A protein has these predicted regions:
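Hydrophobic alpha-helical targeting segments used for export or membrane insertion
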Residues: 9-15, 139
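C-terminal motif of bacterial Sec signal peptides marking the signal peptidase cleavage site
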Residues: 18-19
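Acidic/polar, low-complexity intrinsically disordered N-terminal segments immediately downstream
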Residues: 24-32
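A short, acidic, amphipathic alpha-helical segment used as a generic capping/interface helix at domain edges
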Residues: 323-330
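Active-site neighborhood of phospho(di)ester-bond hydrolases with catalytic His/Asp-centered motifs
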Residues: 340-343
Length: 411
């Protein structure tokens, strides 16, 4: 399998670069879309990806994100602790979840990513020992979000180490069929998708958070604090986990909502790490090739977390954020996948600094971007609250740029 992927990556890496066109379809503005969506009982649930046929010589078909039959453009946010911070002392208290959703609705946020699970291995008994209560609580969160007309993107396995540590297995067991880690992956995915698929508030399904950053590390002994190679997580292990997750989601979700990996922006050396265990910088073709490995079918998006204002490629040096986005979107297009910025910005020093990201995303035609992170009590790293000055202008930016998206798409 490794040999196959290396050969396929080599072929993909030599594809020529090209620009990326905006979707030719005129979509509805976000307010119009949500009105059509939330008030329509027969509508297809959630965001989904469709292919727009290519036109013209050498044109590349484009995968676009849709909602209720319209091309979807939006910027939203995160509420990392929406569910996970409600798991307290062996019980579940959803008071803060409801309060958070109330604020997000009041502030006009229409789509939110959240940790649909735990972070630490010690927290897993909330599900393993109290499965029915746990799933019932998730359903309540989804139902309340639907009442608030907020779309949710649940991220299932936020911390790569939690499940393996809980079962006393090496980290590479994410890629080992028959391991207890993969067994949990399969059970949990089926349980959560089955529990939540009936809700219109579920916009998509995401594997987890930035798993690509743990792959093929030349300094794995230092990173994982072990000399045991069974903990040297490989790109193939992550590919297997992503495929397993996505296959279950696709089988259990009759509405075929979009599926996301949850990856960070790929490391500048991600291809070289996979192929030759080195930190050498990838060129643009190698970047496109390794993007394929970390977003396998039936995942139908390419997710990146954009915190930098540019990146390096060996064939063109340090590039601007605008060029970075063009390369990322072209990589997604060559794979017939939609490009999503799953996180961006963090803590910046001014409103203008945030605008640079929003303007770049708008100009590039990125359909979905999610700002990190609203926290009701400000108790998540690099977060903002609704009452602090930064939070007030960030919520204002979300509203402002959604209005710009609406004007761009003709509604």
């Amino acid at each position: 399998m490794k040999r196959f992927f290396r050969s396929a990556l080599l072929l993909l890496s030599v594809l020529s670069t090209a620009g990326c066109n905006r979707p030719s379809d005129k979509g509805a503005g976000i307010s119009d879309l949500q009105t059509r969506y939330w008030n329509n009982e027969s509508v297809r649930k959630g965001l989904y990806v469709k292919n727009v046929p290519a036109t013209g010589v050498n044109a590349v078909s484009e995968a676009v994100i849709c909602l209720a039959g319209w091309v979807y453009h939006a910027t939203g946010g995160h509420c990392y602790g929406l569910f996970s911070y409600c798991l307290k002392d062996g019980g579940i208290d959803l008071t803060d979840a409801y309060a958070s959703l109330d604020i997000l609705k009041e502030q006009g946020v229409g789509v939110v990513r959240f940790n649909c699970g735990v972070f630490y291995s010690e927290e897993l008994p909330a599900y393993t020992d109290h499965r029915d209560d746990y799933l019932a609580a998730l359903r309540k969160v989804a139902a309340y979000a639907q009442q608030c007309e907020i779309g949710l993107i649940p991220s299932f396995f936020w911390n790569y180490s939690a499940v393996s540590l809980y079962y006393g297995e090496p980290y590479r067991c994410w890629g080992k069929a028959g391991s207890r880690t993969v067994g949990f992956l399969m059970r949990y995915t089926e349980d959560v998708v089955t529990a939540l698929r009936e809700y219109k508030s579920i916009f998509g399904w995401e594997f987890g958070n930035e798993l690509n950053l743990q792959a093929d590390l030349p300094n794995w002994q230092e990173r994982f604090d072990t000399e045991d190679p069974a903990n040297w997580t490989k790109g193939d292990d992550i590919h297997f986990a992503f495929r397993t997750f996505a296959d279950i989601v696709r089988a259990k979700d009759p509405d075929s909502r979009m599926i996301l990996s949850g990856n960070a922006t790929l490391r500048p050396s991600q291809y070289h790490q996979y192929v030759e265990n080195s930190w050498d910088t990838d060129d643009t073709g190698q970047y496109r090739a390794i993007t394929n490995l970390f977003n396998p079918y039936p995942i139908n998006t390419v997710t990146e977390h954009v915190y930098e204002t540019g990146r390096k490629f060996s064939d063109c040096g340090k590039v601007s954020l605008d060029r970075q986005l063009r390369e990322a979107m072209y990589a997604a297009r060559t794979l017939n996948k939609a490009y999503v910025v799953g996180e961006f910005a963090g803590v910046l020093q001014s409103e203008e600094a945030y605008r640079k990201y929003y303007d770049a995303f708008l100009d590039a035609g990125v359909q979905l971007t999610l700002l990190w992170n609203f926290a009701l009590r400000g108790d998540v790293e690099h977060s903002f609250t609704a009452t602090e000055p930064r939070g007030q202008y960030l919520f204002g930016l979300i509203r402002e740029y959604n209005e710009k998206y609406a004007r761009e798409t003709g509604k």
